[in-house]
């Protein structure tokens, strides 16, 4: 089977499920990165998570890689008002979450910064991509209360 035929076959297999997901209330989420120029069809998914953003060097602010790219994705909501666009903060080995989450004042300030960032860029929310609370994959020691701090951060973000 030719590669192009295989790709068409795979697309044909998943497309009805994708459209069905939108009509049944299921969520179809796509991560779209700052470093690609691909613009997704806003009717194929229910949510776009823009990858990536992070916790600022001050430990409480929010930033996004390539805000112009992010705004391009937000404009897709003009074509499909039901589409939700979120900023994914963190990612593999990234985030600076632990010091912020372990401090109540910083946590609350960060939550306010997330809200302000969403308002400023017309985002529908934030995706926290913290890998992995209490089990740092980089080999560094994680604080013993990191899982609890993660829970507190989620509470404050709500």
Task: Set out the residue ranges of the language-model regions.
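Mobile, glycine-rich extracellular loop/lid and propeptide segments
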Residues: 126-133
